[in-house]
UniProtKB/Swiss-Prot annotation:
Positions carrying Phosphothreonine: T199
Protein name, UniProt field: Chaperone protein DnaK
Organism: Legionella pneumophila (strain Paris)
Family per record: Belongs to the heat shock protein 70 family.
Biased composition (Polar residues): 609-623
Classification via InterPro entries: ATPase_NBD, Chaperone_DnaK, Heat_shock_70_CS, HSP70_C_sf, HSP70_peptide-bd_sf, Hsp_70_fam
Gene: dnaK
Skewed-composition ranges (Acidic residues): 629-644
Record's keyword terms, sorted: ATP-binding, Chaperone, Nucleotide-binding, Phosphoprotein, Stress response
Length: 644
């Protein structure tokens, strides 16, 4: 029997896996890598390059090298998110005849699923080379927060690549399958925090033993389909470009070639700073002007990078709160936290997740491979190789139709287990109305126009009657892929009309490149290098906290205090650019002393606020000291056990 493969089609990287016996196997590509860059390039010789070969030539061919296509999938050209993307990428995004966002390469317009299909074809070939037989079927993963259009476009991409897509499953759910398949049976609730190359998802999943089956039930899901590693790269690119402009007066945004080199360097620096405290961004001959060639050389510390992406990491917390609320759970009821997606390797992300959930995330799940492994497990369930696993996924967004007054009437609420079916009876708004338009919507807003329009169709030849008399039965049917079929029927005549929601946008991939560690040969040089890196890190950290505090206390500082701190910050920034350790230490001390009074004020302010809050809750604390004590102890206990 032919194998069904599991594919993680990511924004940045893709991965393919297959079940061998009772073990999932991640398959290496022809270059020997377990993940493949989700990049497609078109050369002047009419050759199509996919993966590493496309990535290697991106600097010399930026306008015909397509990356992060997944961020365009199922989106209209006029979507503000697409407009933002246009400014971020060197290739051309244009408006298709149907209003969707497509790409233009070598005077040809291509839909995103066509580009994504090239990556899927590479994954298919990788699996076929390993298995020694043709592969025709696949399970493909998508972000949990993908809407109906985006899911349909993913299926289209599979079809273009010559694959029958047996099932579309959500990435966090796939990761939960990968984590839970070989764990001991028993009930537990896990949070899957998935921050990939272009999208963010959080899913709360209950793993339980039900009638001898290992049941994975998604309780709630939330996310942001335009937040990921690409945004972290962009924040760093903007910083590097602005620093270069300060030094030279040249804006690198006007040079696609330089911008592509900057993107590669930013991605590399970001990865290095997950394991190192400091790195050098060194790009010789980045550009030139009348005076000659220009070189970019900027020292970057982990603290500086963290200050640049702090707000992006904070954006992931609100969806976590919403998912917990929708699941009807508190943080203390989560047993384990799983991290998925290459961007979760960043220490700041791990720290933020640990602080929010009150427990250390598990380290035994490979963030780059877990999703593909889960897809392979689901593929084995569909083919009958694995028999005792039941997966209950949900629809991430509410579905409904537009009714009188421009209101969205929901037929299926968000976080409803799929497959599911819902029927509701509506009537006409005017006397003698002979046709109704069914406008299908997806989203959470009351106002119809504020939600995503999935499509519309007309039910005609309704017998004339006073308003409110005809009975039109509207049925929403969501299949196991999360794809919607809508039908409407006039109960009097039996006349019916239906629509399968179709999208004509497309996508690409997700996942992150491997880390590079620089080994130094001489121990003494290592020691000096580390000391300087830590010192710069300390300086950047202090600068960031001082600048933040000055904003918070702007009204409470005297002009002299402000001037003193600003001067100290400026001098320390200048010292950090050099290599004189003593000078950095001196300027660090000056800023520390200058900000001491400000720190005392913050402490005093927080202390007085804390005392006020304590006074308000004192009576509550006295009534339930035991319960609160137990919760605290439980947090500590879980942490300790995790560490063992």
């Amino acid at each position: 029997m032919a194998k069904i493969i599991g594919i993680d089609l990511g924004t940045t990287n893709s991965c393919v896996a297959v079940m061998e016996g009772d073990k999932p196997k991640v398959i290496e590509n022809s270059e020997g890598h377990r993940t493949t860059p989700s990049i497609v390039a078109f050369t002047d010789d009419n050759e199509i390059l996919v993966g590493q070969s496309a990535k290697r030539q991106s600097v010399t061919n930026p306008e015909k090298t397509l990356f992060a296509i997944k961020r365009l999938i199922g989106r209209r050209f006029d979507d503000p998110i697409v407009q933002k993307d246009i400014k971020m990428v060197p290739y051309k995004i244009m408006k298709a005849d149907n209003g969707d966002a497509w790409v233009r390469v070598k005077d040809q317009d291509k839909a995103p699923p066509q580009i994504s299909a090239e990556v899927l074809r590479k994954m298919k070939k990788t699996a076929e080379d390993y298995l020694g037989e043709e592969v025709k079927e696949a399970v493909i993963t998508v972000p949990a927060y993908f809407n109906d259009s985006q899911r349909q476009a993913t299926k289209d991409a599979g079809r273009i690549a010559g694959l029958e897509v047996k099932r579309i499953i959500n990435e966090p759910t796939a990761a939960a399958l990968a984590y839970g398949m070989d764990k001991k049976r028993g009930d537990s609730v896990i949070a899957v925090y998935d921050l990939g190359g272009g999208t963010f998802d959080i899913s709360i999943i209950e793993i339980a033993e039900v009638d001898g089956e290992h049941q994975f039930e998604v309780l709630a899901t939330n996310g942001d389909t335009f937040l990921g590693g690409e945004d972290f790269d962009l924040a760093l690119i903007e910083y590097l470009a602005s620093e270069f402009k300060k030094d030279t007066g040249i804006d690198l945004h006007n040079d696609p070639l330089a911008l592509q080199r900057l993107k590669e360097a930013a991605e590399k620096a970001k990865i290095e700073l997950s394991s190192a405290q400091q790195t050098d961004v060194n790009l010789p001959y980045i550009t030139a002007d009348a005076s000659g060639p220009k070189h970019l050389n900027i020292k970057l510390t982990r603290a500086k990078l963290e200050s640049l992406v702090e707000k992006l990491v904070e954006r992931t917390i609100e969806p976590c709160k919403t998912a917990l609320k929708d699941a009807g759970l508190t943080v203390s009821q989560i047993n384990e936290v799983i991290l998925v997606g290459g961007q979760t390797r960043m220490p700041l992300v791990q720290k933020t997740v640990e602080e929010f959930f009150g427990k250390e995330p598990r380290k035994d799940v490979n963030p780059d491979e877990a999703v593909a492994v889960g897809a392979a497990i689901q593929a084995a369930v569909l083919s009958g190789e694995v028999k005792d696993i039941l997966l209950l996924d949900v629809t991430p967004l509410s579905l409904g139709i537009e009714t009188m007054g421009g209101v969205m009437t929901k037929l299926i609420e968000k976080n409803t287990t799929i497959p599911t079916k819902a029927t509701q009876v509506f009537s006409t708004a005017d006397d003698n109305q002979t046709a109704v338009t069914v406008h299908v919507l997806q989203g959470e807003r009351e106002q119809a126009s504020a939600n995503k329009s999935l499509g519309r169709f007309d039910l005609r030849d309704i017998p004339p009657a006073p308003r409110g008399v005809p009975q039109i039965e509207v049925t929403f049917d969501i299949d196991a892929n999360g794809i919607l079929n809508v039908s409407a029927k006039d109960k009097a005549t039996g006349k019916a009309q239906s629509i399968v929601i179709k999208a004509s946008s497309g996508l690409s991939e997700e996942e992150v490149a491997a880390m590079v560690k620089d080994a130094q040969s001489h121990a003494e040089e290592d020691k000096k290098f580390k000391e300087m890196a830590e010192l710069r890190n300390q300086a950047d950290s202090l600068i960031h906290s001082c600048e933040k505090s000055m904003k918070d206390l702007a009204d409470e500082l005297s002009e002299d205090e402000k001037k003193g701190i600003e001067t100290a910050i400026s001098e320390l920034k200048e010292a950090v650019q050099g290599t004189d350790k003593t000078r950095i230490e001196d300027k660090l001390k000056v800023l520390t002393d200058a900000s001491a009074k400000m720190a005392e004020r913050i402490y005093a302010k927080k202390s007085s606020e804390g005392q006020a809050a304590q006074g308000q809750t004192q009576s509550q604390e006295s009534t339930k000291p035991v319960e609160e004590g137990v919760v605290d102890a439980e947090f500590e206990e879980v942490k300790e056990e995790d560490k063992k």
